[in-house]
Amino acid sequence: MFAQPFDHSFNNDDLFSQYVNIDGSSTDGNKDVSFPSDFDQFFSLDSLSSNCGEQSPIISTSKQQTHPSPQWAKDFWSLPPDAPSSLGQAPLAFQDTVHPSAVSDLNVNLEASSTTCPAETRSSPTTPPGTPRRKPKSALVTPKSIQRHREPNGRRGLQHKQSFSPSLTRPSQFQKGRMAYQEAWAHRLQNLNFLRSADDRFPLSPPPSDILPQQENIAADNSAVHIHHSGDSTEMHHHFDTSIFTPSPAISMPSPCTGVLSRQQARYLNHSNNSTVTSSPPSADDIFPSPHSSDPQSMSSWHSDALGTPGLFTPDLQSHDAQAWWPPMNARVPQRQPSYQQVVASPPPQQPIQNTTHQHDLANSQHDILQGGLMIQMDPSAYDMTATANSSFSSTTMAPTASSCQENHTYSHVPTAHAKYVDASSFATPQLHPQSRSPSLSPRADRSPKNGLAMHHSITMKAQRRQPGRKISSNSMNVPKPVKGLNGSGSPKGAKSVTVSFVNFTLNDSQKILTGVAPSGSSKTKARREQEARDRRRRISEAALNAVRKAGGDVEALEAVMF
């Protein structure tokens, strides 16, 4: 069932020769047939003048239904005639590629309609009332992304060569057709704020462009798009899962089964209906992270920016809570600036709110210092670290949208009624209100006294830890001297004789009297050293006897042992 759109067994040379050999008389008729009525899904059926920047791209429907399609279009690029009626049971062939005749087909229709249709401005939407949600969906599918998606390298190079061949298309009209695409899409993206109603918004995370054609229920008569909404907000956490939005590779892969596609289409449409936002819609930079939104290099931006955030919040979002998801583009950049400017020059009633944001930033920096390895310990009672550490820890674990949500509510004073993630937006403001007037006006002056006290405290603690080590080391260096001083403390002469010129500090030196002489020494020196050793022993024995006598001990017993 799915093998036919992805069959690579066709011959590129035969296909190219068939395309080149088409005569000029039937070129305009055959080119239009390569696009069945599926192409009208993505563009509104209104007029197009020579001013291409202000109009929508048009494909005439009369030619598409009258001329029979050639054989190569039926094989690969086209649907059978009864395919639009059974769109839910067959894969869309339009999702795979766009033949280069599409550009020349648009070129021909541009030339034909520019001479007949009057100019018409785009100040008001011109789609019929039955199709309110078709334009936001079509903004996600660019012609470049459709042309680039799921094409083998050989076929892509062949189409590139065909599209720029001078024998097939006229250069000036081809360039005008390309400019019509780009300017029409740019102008349509600029007017998104005015063309959509309040309930007609982008979903919270736009899907890749290859899934969008599979997930829309488009009627076969090309007159209206009927999208059914369930309106049940409790099913959103079952509907919105990131398995729908898997990044598409650049090579052809088999499509999933039609039952899964129909379920995913219902889930995605239910989610986009129930999670409408009231703030201004995102700009073109938010919708298209790169010029080719379905390239595999840019698919990571969908997952990192849009698909990473919904897991942190509960799905039952109210209309006023969703300002954190799509904040206005002009309000994102200067959010950091008013916190310091308004703290310096602002009336007193506004100071608590601005200071809470300032203290929240300060708490984040303090917690980063504590967690970063410096280990500067501060007194919890002096700074209320129980409040600031909890708030900073929860803010670091939250997504960046949580901080933007908090800053949004801080500056705009929006009364919020959070259902599930109350602590995500109010974890800093109620706890820090008592200290709102305490810090000074400059942020560094506010941070310096407490950090200075903490650093001074840590320095004194380190100094106290180092001093016992120095005392112990000095005592270890001077261990033999007190022992010798005790031994010779009986007489002052003995204390003087302790200082010897040669000292060999080993384990048992305190118990030895060094009397040896070097082998090269003279006999007189050896005799003198022996005499000094005898005198030293005598003085030591006398000092010991005097100490025992002063203590009241038995001197006779000691003399009997010593002598």
UniProtKB/Swiss-Prot annotation:
Biased amino acid composition, Polar residues: 54-69, 160-175, 430-441
Region described as Disordered: spans on this chain: 54-81, 112-176, 272-318, 334-356, 430-494, 516-538
Coiled coil regions in record: none
Keyword flag Ribonucleoprotein: no
Phenotype on disruption: Loses conidial pigments and exhibits autolytic phenotype.
Disulfide-bond pairs as recorded: none
An example Gene Ontology biological process: conidium formation
Signals that turn on the gene: Expression is controlled by abaA.
Top-level division of the source organism's lineage: Eukaryota
Sorted UniProt keywords: Activator, Conidiation, Sporulation, Transcription, Transcription regulation
Low complexity compositional bias, start-end: 272-305
InterPro entries membership: WetA (IPR040112)
Function: BrlA, abaA and wetA are pivotal regulators of conidiophore development and conidium maturation. They act individually and together to regulate their own expression and that of numerous other sporulation-specific genes.
Similarity comment: Belongs to the wetA family.
Matches recorded under PANTHER family: DEVELOPMENTAL REGULATORY PROTEIN WETA, PROTEIN ESC1/WETA-RELATED
Protein name as annotated: Developmental regulatory protein wetA
Organism for this UniProt entry: Aspergillus oryzae (strain ATCC 42149 / RIB 40)
